[in-house]
From Swiss-Prot:
UniProt keywords, alphabetically: Chaperone, Cytoplasm, Stress response
Cytoplasm recorded as keyword: yes
Xref: CDD domains: GrpE
Assembly mode: Homodimer.
Similarity comment text for this entry: Belongs to the GrpE family.
A GO biological-process term: protein folding
Record-linked Pfam families: GrpE (PF01025)
Annotated localization: Cytoplasm
Molecular function terms, GO-annotated: adenyl-nucleotide exchange factor activity; protein homodimerization activity; protein-folding chaperone binding; unfolded protein binding
Protein's name in the database: Protein GrpE
Domain of life of the native organism: Bacteria
Function: Participates actively in the response to hyperosmotic and heat shock by preventing the aggregation of stress-denatured proteins, in association with DnaK and GrpE. It is the nucleotide exchange factor for DnaK and may function as a thermosensor. Unfolded proteins bind initially to DnaJ; upon interaction with the DnaJ-bound protein, DnaK hydrolyzes its bound ATP, resulting in the formation of a stable complex. GrpE releases ADP from DnaK; ATP binding to DnaK triggers the release of the substrate protein, thus completing the reaction cycle.
Amino acid sequence: MSEKEKKDLSQECEELKEKYRELEEYAKRLKAEYENYREEVAREKRELIKNANEYLISRLIPILDDFERALNQKDHEESFYEGVKLIYKKLLNTLEKEGLSKIQVGETFDPFEYEAVERVETDDVEEYTVLEVLESGYKFHGKVLKPAKVKVAVRPRKKDEESPDKKE
C-alpha cells in the first residue's frame, strides 16, 4: 500500500469519524426533542382532564347549594334530614377528592373570593367585615369557580351624604 493510499484512507477514516460524531449529536438532539415533546403532550393531557373535571364540578355545585338549603330548613322529618345530610357529605367528600374546596370565610371582604350581595350599615365592626355567608363559595385546584355570597359591613352614611340632591 502506497503512502498516498494510506493518507487517503486515513483522511477518509477521519471524515467518517466526523460524520459519525455529527450523526451521534443529531440523534442525541432528536432524543431530547422527543422527550420534551412527550412531556408537553402529557402536560397538555393533564390540563385537558383538569378542565373537563372543572366543567363537571362547576355543574355539580348547584346541587351542593340545594342540599345546603334543604339542610338549613328547620321543620322536616329527622330521617329525611339525616338522609339528605349523608348524601351531602358524600357528594362533598367526593368533590373534595377531585380538587374542590369550600372558600373559607375570613374576616375582611375579598372581592376575588366573595360576592357582596347585601351591605349592612353598622359601626359595630370594621368596614368591609364579612357579617354572614348567605351561600358558600368554591374553588377547584385553587381557582375560584363560585364566589361565596356574603353580607358585608359598611360605614353608615352621614345625614348630608344620604340625599345629595337636597342641597339648597
